[in-house]
């Protein structure tokens, strides 16, 4: 098995770090099996049958919960062993009760590591073949609309959720709808990459703008309504956005900017957090919110519109945000970050604006639903006609531009198709209450499918390389290969989604900032030591040669 990627200190650090976890996990599984065997024998002897069964279930449940979500730590008040020691010390000492209680977390870590190994094998070795991309418009559209039809037949759902604002079944821009929205866009986005469907470039730019719009809309709604600016909430959001991408960068020796959507969402999430978190106690005042919106626009104008400011601000972060495409080595390191973030520099603010006026629009829709039939039909028909007209002119005079020209207009016009879609998707109460749950399910794992596609669906073969090839598990049978690789790819993406949330619950406590800080410092110390040790092991032999 030949590798196209050199062994790096980061990769070696992961290997060294996972070895003790494997040992601890195997030992915990053995302890759990031994406990189960003893319990089974006791049950067969009919001694205290009911009490033992209850205790067994209770202990297994506790292994899932892990005391306040506070990382690897004791969950049972009856746990034996040095409970006064920190979780890290108990892990190093292989404390039996601790390992049994955290068996499922250890198992999740191992499963995640196995999936990272699969990433590496698929994209950095010659174990599997690769094939070239091929685009056929008829096949592309056939596959996409086939998925839509299957989704409509098998997963069409009518929702009756109540609005958190009015308590009525208005459901304007409800969660089911936005998840479905993300789902059908993500499918087209991924197929665009798989088939190299260059003619849909402008559409993909709009889809990415929609994702960033949702970042502004969703985060503003959460922080404005719940007023939760806690450290735990912030850490959970950063974990969700960056956990998988960080390990992908380490294991595969890629730059953070290769997965540009992750830093984009992280940046705009931080900007929403800062906008509402600063002077948060005054957020109920309309004048303060207006000033914050104005300040956001001013910041964007200064950073992205004034030449030289972006480079001046971001140059200290070149190590993190820099990217050198092997196919375009002549470009500046910050070019990719400047280009990608600049395309959607305003749309996150538009998302915040829509979120702020969401209750107002919902109240208008509530009143409209209670109006007379003729008036209701007239208003909805007018809205639909206006939206369709605006959408048509945008399509004819903006969307049809060549991609270089379109990119110049995109930051200022991407809100138009988004608004048109929102108007048409929410035109009637029944229509906005429908969703295709298969697409909504895909919409929940967009981050995982985005990152995974680079390595287990497509192939680059080299660090920081764009995925120009396809992973080929069934050579010479492109459609069978598409079916097999897609099935594996989607299944793994879903598992990564679940594992990310499982480990987030384990290591980020929701109500214990002290434990969160402890976990963070412990992780930094461990990672630093592992990297330093790995760096020495790799560097010394090279200097001796």
Swiss-Prot record:
Q: What class of enzyme is it?
A: transferase
**The organism of origin for this protein:** Arabidopsis thaliana (Mouse-ear cress)
Residues where Phosphoserine is found: 45
Distribution of this protein across tissues and organs: Expressed in cells undergoing secondary wall thickeningin a SND1-dependent manner, such as xylem cells. Slightly elevated in the inflorescence stems. Mainly observed in leaves and inflorescence stem tops, but present ubiquitously.
The gene name reads: RWA2
Q: When the coding gene is removed by deletion, what phenotypic consequences does the entry describe?
A: Decreased levels of acetylated cell wall polymers and lower amounts of acetic acid in single mutant. Increased tolerance toward the necrotrophic fungal pathogen Botrytis cinerea. Severe growth phenotypes (e.g. dwarf and abnormal flower organs) associated with reduction in the secondary wall thickening and the stem mechanical strength in the quadruple mutant rwa1 rwa2 rwa3 rwa4 and characterized by reduced xylan acetylation and altered ratio of non-methylated to methylated glucuronic acid side chains. Absence of interfascicular fibers and xylem cells differentiation.
Q: Which UniProt keywords apply?
A: Endoplasmic reticulum, Glycoprotein, Golgi apparatus, Membrane, Oxidoreductase, Phosphoprotein, Transferase, Transmembrane, Transmembrane helix
Identify this protein by name.
Answer: Protein REDUCED WALL ACETYLATION 2
A GO BP entry:
xyloglucan metabolic process
């Amino acid at each position: 098995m030949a590798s196209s990627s050199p062994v790096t200190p980061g990769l070696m650090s992961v290997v060294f770090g996972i070895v003790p976890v494997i040992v601890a996990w195997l030992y915990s599984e053995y302890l759990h099996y031994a406990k189960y065997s003893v319990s089974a024998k006791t049950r067969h002897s009919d001694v205290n049958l009911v009490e033992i069964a209850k205790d067994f279930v209770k202990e297994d449940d506790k292994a899932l919960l892990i005391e306040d979500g506070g990382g690897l730590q004791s969950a049972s008040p009856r746990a034996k062993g040095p409970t006064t020691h920190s979780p890290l010390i108990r892990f190093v000492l292989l404390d039996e009760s601790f390992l049994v209680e955290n068996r499922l977390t250890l198992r999740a870590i191992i499963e995640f590591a196995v999936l990272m190994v699969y990433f590496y094998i698929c994209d950095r070795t010659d174990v599997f073949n690769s094939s070239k991309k091929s685009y056929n418009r008829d096949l592309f559209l056939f596959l996409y609309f086939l998925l839509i039809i299957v989704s409509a037949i098998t997963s069409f759902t009518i929702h009756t959720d109540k609005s958190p604002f009015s308590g009525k079944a208005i459901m304007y821009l409800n969660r089911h709808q936005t998840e479905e929205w993300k789902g059908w866009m993500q499918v087209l986005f991924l197929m665009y990459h798989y088939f190299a469907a260059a003619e849909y470039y402008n559409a993909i730019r709009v889809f990415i703008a929609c994702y960033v719009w949702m970042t502004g809309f969703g985060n503003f709604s959460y922080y404005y309504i719940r007023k939760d600016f806690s450290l735990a909430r912030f850490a959970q959001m950063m974990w969700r956005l960056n956990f998988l991408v960080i390990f992908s960068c380490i294991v595969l020796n890629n730059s953070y900017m290769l997965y540009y959507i992750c830093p984009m969402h992280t940046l705009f999430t931080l900007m929403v957090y800062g906008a509402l978190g600063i002077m948060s106690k005054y957020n109920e005042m309309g004048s303060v919110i207006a000033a914050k919106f104005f300040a956001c626009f001013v910041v964007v104008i200064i950073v992205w519109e004034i030449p030289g400011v972006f480079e001046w601000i971001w140059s200290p972060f070149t190590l993190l945000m820099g990217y050198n495409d092997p196919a375009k080595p002549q470009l500046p390191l910050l070019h990719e970050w400047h280009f990608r973030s600049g395309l959607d520099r305003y749309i996150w603010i538009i998302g915040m604006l829509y979120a702020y006026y969401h209750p107002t629009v919902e109240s208008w829709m509530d009143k409209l639903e209670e109006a007379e039939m003729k008036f209701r039909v007239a208003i909805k028909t007018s809205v639909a006609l206006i939206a369709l007209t605006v959408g048509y002119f945008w399509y004819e005079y903006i969307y049809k531009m060549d991609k270089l020209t379109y990119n110049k207009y995109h930051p200022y016009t991407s809100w138009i198709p988004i608004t048109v879609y929102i108007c048409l998707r929410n035109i009637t109460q029944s229509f906005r209450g429908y969703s295709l749950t298969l697409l909504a399910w895909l919409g929940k794992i967009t981050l995982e499918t985005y990152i995974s596609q680079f390595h287990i669906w497509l192939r680059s073969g080299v660090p920081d390389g764009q995925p120009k090839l396809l992973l080929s598990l069934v050579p010479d049978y492109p459609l069978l290969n598409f079916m097999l690789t897609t099935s594996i790819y989607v299944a793994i993406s879903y598992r990564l989604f679940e594992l990310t949330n499982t480990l987030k619950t384990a290591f980020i406590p929701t109500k214990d900032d002290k434990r969160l800080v402890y976990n963070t410092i412990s992780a930094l110390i461990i990672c630093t030591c592992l990297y330093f040790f790995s760096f020495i092991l790799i560097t010394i032999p090279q200097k001796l040669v």
